[in-house]
């Protein structure tokens, strides 16, 4: 490990490494703590409901051009395989709207917030250090996210998303996603508007994380598409390895064994 000796004293001080504090190894770096003046969103969370605040159902509204694009893509194939069966992560915004009992772990620090979704092990990094979206970023399913605090709510802007031509949430490189994430209590969301789709009758505790999601794309959607996802805290739960692709590999291995 590198020592911290001044050059002028290397010959003497570094010989006495156990006696001179200046020569002791530098302490290992530690992660920056979450800023004390903002709510800590850290923890394991499970989505239990998604709603459309417009009350018009959860299916997105596409533009005529968007409908044509999706139909044209699907018409090329006799059948479009189910993405989950092939361990193919659907990316944003679907990863924040999944209510299929796979948790999301949030780790918050002062400079960034990391979300790890157990489903297909999709990872989001939300940068909180004031940086802008880069010019040389390779588009990907979860995009590139930057966040700013608005009081107790974290506002996330996601861009640089890769193209996705499957319903219900297609994307182009022009797709933009804005989120407003904050903590509340279950009692504060008891008045549920039309379009609320719950997967459990009642969350297991009163701690609720709310993610207000707005998806825009000038070619795909008929205006901004808004959804609100509700997550319950899973205090005694840990995210696990999502070893989906291992099954396909083992199946291929067995086929090779049988062909010998």
Residue ranges of each PLM-predicted region?
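Terminal low-complexity, poorly structured segments
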Residues: 3, 14-15, 37
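Bacterial N-terminal signal peptides
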Residues: 9-22
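Hydrophobic small-molecule pocket/channel-lining residues, especially in calycin-type beta-barrels
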Residues: 23-260
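N-terminal secretory signal peptides that target proteins for export/translocation
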Residues: 1-7
């Amino acid at each position: 490990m590198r020592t911290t000796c001044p050059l002028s004293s290397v010959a003497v001080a570094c010989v006495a490494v156990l006696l001179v504090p200046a020569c002791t190894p530098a302490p290992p770096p530690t992660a920056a703590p979450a800023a004390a003046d903002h709510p800590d969103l850290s923890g394991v969370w499970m989505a239990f409901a998604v709603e459309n605040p417009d009350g018009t159902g959860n299916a997105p509204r596409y533009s005529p051009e968007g409908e044509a694009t999706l139909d044209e893509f699907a018409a090329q194939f006799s059948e479009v395989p189910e993405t989950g069966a092939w361990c193919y992560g659907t990316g944003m915004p679907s990863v924040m709207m999944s209510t299929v009992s796979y948790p999301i772990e949030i780790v918050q620090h002062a400079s960034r917030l990391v979300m790890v979704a157990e489903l297909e092990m999709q990872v989001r990094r939300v940068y909180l250090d004031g940086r802008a979206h880069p010019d040389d970023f390779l588009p990907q399913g979860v995009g590139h996210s930057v966040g700013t605090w608005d009081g107790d709510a974290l506002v996330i802007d996601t861009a640089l998303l890769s193209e996705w031509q499957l319903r219900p949430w297609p994307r182009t490189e022009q797709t933009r996603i804005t989120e407003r994430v904050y903590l509340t209590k279950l009692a504060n969301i008891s008045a549920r508007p039309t379009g609320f789709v719950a997967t459990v009758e009642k969350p297991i505790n009163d701690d609720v994380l709310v993610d207000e999601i707005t998806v825009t794309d000038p070619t795909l959607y008929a205006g901004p598409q808004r959804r609100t996802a509700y997550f319950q805290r899973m205090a005694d739960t840990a995210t696990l390895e999502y070893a989906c692709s291992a099954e396909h590999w083992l199946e291929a291995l067995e086929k090779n064994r049988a062909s010998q």
